[in-house]
Regions:
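Small-residue-enriched hydrophobic alpha-helices in membranes
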Residues: 2-79, 85-190
Length: 190
């Protein structure tokens, strides 16, 4: 074999390796896209949302089919963080609410809830999640109403506030409750 033959053979080998690698990358990209589409479809089934943009927004906020059941609890988590930290009473009530909604201990949704109770989510998460909840409620696919969610938030606000039961809801919590009630009911914020 001449040097030219060796170089040509090496060139063909490198070219074949390149295209095999590109094929694998393309197949993997297609698998990821199919998995993401499947995840969005599952979240759509669980939330009643069908608009692809809303489902992508859910995904962009980090929700998965395993954690999307937490979406209606996000406003209550926002209220719990109103005064800069989550109290033991608020944590206990939020955990109890999660359990009544089928979120079992040790599941991805439970771990996400724990993370949100330990570290305050970004304000953007609260704003976008509230908008998504309003869209979810407008589908009529859920028994829950905006009023139900606001009452849940009020229960969280009252969970650990006030000495001797006086002023159980702080000014910060009251402000968030007013804003959430308006937003969830599709009214302009006061």
């Amino acid at each position: 074999m001449t040097d030219k033959d060796i170089i040509a053979e090496r060139g063909r080998s490198l070219e074949e390796d390149y295209f095999r690698r590109k094929d694998r990358e393309l197949i993997e990209k297609m698998r990821r896209a199919a998995a993401a589409e499947q995840a969005r479809a599952e979240m759509g089934t669980k939330t009643g949302l069908s608009d692809p943009a809303l489902l992508e927004e859910l995904e962009g906020l980090g929700f998965t089919p395993d954690t999307v059941t937490l979406l209606p609890l996000v406003p209550a988590i926002q209220v719990a963080w109103a005064e800069g930290g989550v109290t033991a009473g608020e944590r206990a009530l939020l955990t109890k609410l999660a359990r009544t909604r089928g979120i079992a201990e040790g599941t991805p949704a439970d771990r996400q809830l724990g993370d949100w109770l330990d570290r305050r989510p970004a304000e953007e998460v609260f704003v976008r999640a509230t908008r998504l909840i309003r869209a979810m409620l407008s589908t009529g696919a859920h028994e829950e109403s905006a009023t139900d969610l606001v009452k849940l938030c009020e229960a969280i606000a009252a969970a650990s506030g006030g000495l001797f039961g006086v002023n159980r809801v702080s000014a910060e919590e009251r402000q968030i409750l007013t804003s959430l009630a308006a937003e969830l009911n599709g009214r302009p914020n006061p």
